[in-house]
């Protein structure tokens, strides 16, 4: 007989946290919680996003992590500026605190920010690019909830498009 942890489904990186939290097991995350809220996004998310959206050839991946999304974007011919708060070994990453430092970038932003700072990432991203450029973030659906987020973000910057993944399929609304 196996322990429950041994039979729990895992995502593409071997982390069972995403499946456990999807099932509502909030306490399950205690043993697999990543420092600095780092959870890598499967690079196939870029493939699916690019089926529906076009982007400027210059992309800023401001929470690059180990470079999974950046590498996939580069494979499509994008020029990718890579920054992160933590050096996770991805070549060419500039160490930047995206939450507190202000930059201007003439391109689009595609990233998977740490959930606990998603509001700050959204606001700073929108402030960092020219009007009319795009910000695409891989976020939990809960990011759309809450009076405070509505007042600070969505009442001023309503999302243009929201894509929802269900069982690894992309649903376009």
Residue ranges and their predicted role:
Residues 2-173:
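Class I S-adenosyl-L-methionine-dependent methyltransferase catalytic core
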């Amino acid at each position: 007989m196996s322990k429950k942890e041994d039979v729990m489904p895992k995502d593409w990186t071997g982390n069972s946290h995403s499946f456990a939290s999807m099932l509502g097991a909030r306490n399950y995350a205690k043993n697999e919680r990543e420092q600095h809220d780092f959870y890598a996004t499967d690079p196939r998310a870029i493939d699916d996003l690019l089926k529906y959206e076009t982007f400027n050839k210059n992309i800023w991946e401001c929470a690059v992590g180990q470079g999974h999304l950046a590498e996939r974007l580069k494979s499509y011919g994008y020029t990718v500026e890579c920054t992160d708060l933590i050096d996770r070994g991805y070549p060419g990453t500039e160490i930047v605190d995206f939450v507190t430092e202000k930059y201007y970038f003439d391109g689009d932003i595609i990233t998977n920010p740490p959930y606990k700072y998603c509001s700050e990432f959204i606001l700073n991203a929108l402030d960092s690019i020219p009007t009319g450029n795009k910000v695409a973030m891989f976020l939990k659906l809960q990011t759309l909830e809450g009076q405070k987020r509505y007042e600070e973000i969505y009442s001023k910057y309503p999302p243009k498009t929201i894509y929802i993944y269900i069982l690894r399929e992309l649903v376009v609304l």
